[in-house]
């Protein structure tokens, strides 16, 4: 249809551009537009080269219209407006003020600095966490005297954090070209990483089960079987990830299986189980704090001290049970402040959680500190004894003989 004839129809039957706003016809994107003159002090309805419909307007008005939804494949912020003047002689100004129409792409560029800072936080947090986690792992490995079921569960949780963080670093090293080529080894790394993510959350679930059983159900922990918790933590995630990998292979086999396509929910095969674990742990936390408050009220301590102890216990349990992930599980909003808070909070939480678990459940653990202190004193005593023996042996009583009597006296000290 000729552009001029189309504008005549628009001016006659859709002078307010209501139909065009509703249907967004393809006629809006005509490359040329001419003005059809009507007698009278008003400007006729017309369409500009961008595709914006300008309604019939009185002469002398400055008319505003919403910015186009998209142009040349770039989406724009439609909450802002474009302006055009209707002259006194009833003709439109040839220049339209599109300066307020900001591409949505600029919003992404606006967050570029925040994403870079968040990436630095991620690398720093994962490095600090791995260092703390490895130290905690070695302490649990060397201190055999504290190997009760509770500490064995802590040990396994710390192990999953170490493996998860190592796989995270491997994922960051994958080149973009390899990511696009969808190499087999790249998909294997993604699969292993997701397995350790799921095992990490399932060991948080094991922590919740143990605490809930011991505190709420008042069940003797001596009757709990270690192999049951090992099966839950390491074995149950396996079929979940295998199912996810098979579905990825047949239905979404691209980009190293990282991310997901719109409208496809394959990742929820394992993410759904993670969400379920977090919800159950939230119930565990609620019951544990409830029982704790009941016991504190029964004690003779003041109310302020009771609440302080309850808050302290809750804060300590949050990273152990993974409840902190639920604080910003989804983006709280699309405004700038919400986006920035979401970016930084998740970067800090995901990278430093291993560090906090190491601090709360190893470095500040009374049993671990006591056992480590005894082990240190024992090593110091043994070392000082060896030094004294070495000194005694280095001072002979004659050119050919060593006084073993002095060594015996030194060893008896």
Swiss-Prot record:
Q: Which keywords are on file for this protein?
A: Cell membrane, Disulfide bond, G-protein coupled receptor, Glycoprotein, Membrane, Receptor, Signal, Transducer, Transmembrane, Transmembrane helix
Q: What is its main location?
A: membrane
Ranges per topology, Cytoplasmic: 142-148, 217-223, 294-304, 367-413
Membrane topology (Extracellular): 1-110, 174-187, 252-267, 330-336
Q: What are the transmembrane regions?
A: 111-141, 149-173, 188-216, 224-251, 268-293, 305-329, 337-366
Signal peptide (UniProt feature, chain positions): 1-22
Bilayer disposition of the protein: Multi-pass membrane protein
Give the subcellular location: Cell membrane
Q: Which SMART domains match?
A: HormR
State the SUPFAM superfamilies in the record: Family A G protein-coupled receptor-like (SSF81321), Hormone receptor domain (SSF111418)
Q: Which domain of life is it from?
A: Eukaryota
Which InterPro entries does UniProt cross-reference here?
GPCR_2 (IPR050332), GPCR_2-like_7TM (IPR017981), GPCR_2_CRF2_rcpt (IPR003053), GPCR_2_CRF_rcpt (IPR003051), GPCR_2_extracell_dom_sf (IPR036445), GPCR_2_extracellular_dom (IPR001879), GPCR_2_secretin-like (IPR000832), GPCR_2_secretin-like_CS (IPR017983)
Known glycosylation sites? 16, 77, 89, 97
Question: What does the record list as GO biological process?
Answer: adenylate cyclase-modulating G protein-coupled receptor signaling pathway; cell surface receptor signaling pathway; long-term synaptic potentiation
Q: Which family does it belong to?
A: Belongs to the G-protein coupled receptor 2 family.
> What is written about domains in the entry's comments?
The transmembrane domain is composed of seven transmembrane helices that are arranged in V-shape. Transmembrane helix 7 assumes a sharply kinked structure.
Give a short account of what the protein does.
Answer: G-protein coupled receptor for CRH (corticotropin-releasing factor), UCN (urocortin), UCN2 and UCN3. Has high affinity for UCN. Ligand binding causes a conformation change that triggers signaling via guanine nucleotide-binding proteins (G proteins) and down-stream effectors, such as adenylate cyclase. Promotes the activation of adenylate cyclase, leading to increased intracellular cAMP levels.
Q: What name has this protein been given in UniProt?
A: Corticotropin-releasing factor receptor 2
